[in-house]
């Protein structure tokens, strides 16, 4: 997987400039890399390390602490099923088993058509609304197997519009940036569409 694109390097430098220490920008830069590629590769982590002046191991240490970063290619829709204690007590294991049957893959896998990646993840901080899932970082609460089936039907038919981003994973950094960055997503989208 490639390094950050030239357009995203410009964005990265602007992000880094917002912090008193470059290292403080690691998380938004990881989101930026994930948005560009759909996941965070070793090469992109090494590039981020160069940009902020730390080792690749420090970047990986930060990224691996969080469930939101993926270290392998994912499908168009990445479905994270929370199986932490609150969700477990309210049916997460049954929901995960149902999701595996419905999609025809085990957790940690992607469907043959590249449409869905199913992940079993730890806490997504939605304990009061368990069982909860995320689809490309958009939360779904109190999900039943029937709700899951309806969601998959809508995603397959393309009926959710802007509610769920079109590709891979969504960089939250775009949700918290200024308008002058808004055009940069076009480059990242073109790169993802090309894969």
Residue ranges, per PLM feature:
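Signature of N-terminal electron-transfer/Fe-S-associated modules in redox systems
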Residues: 1-195
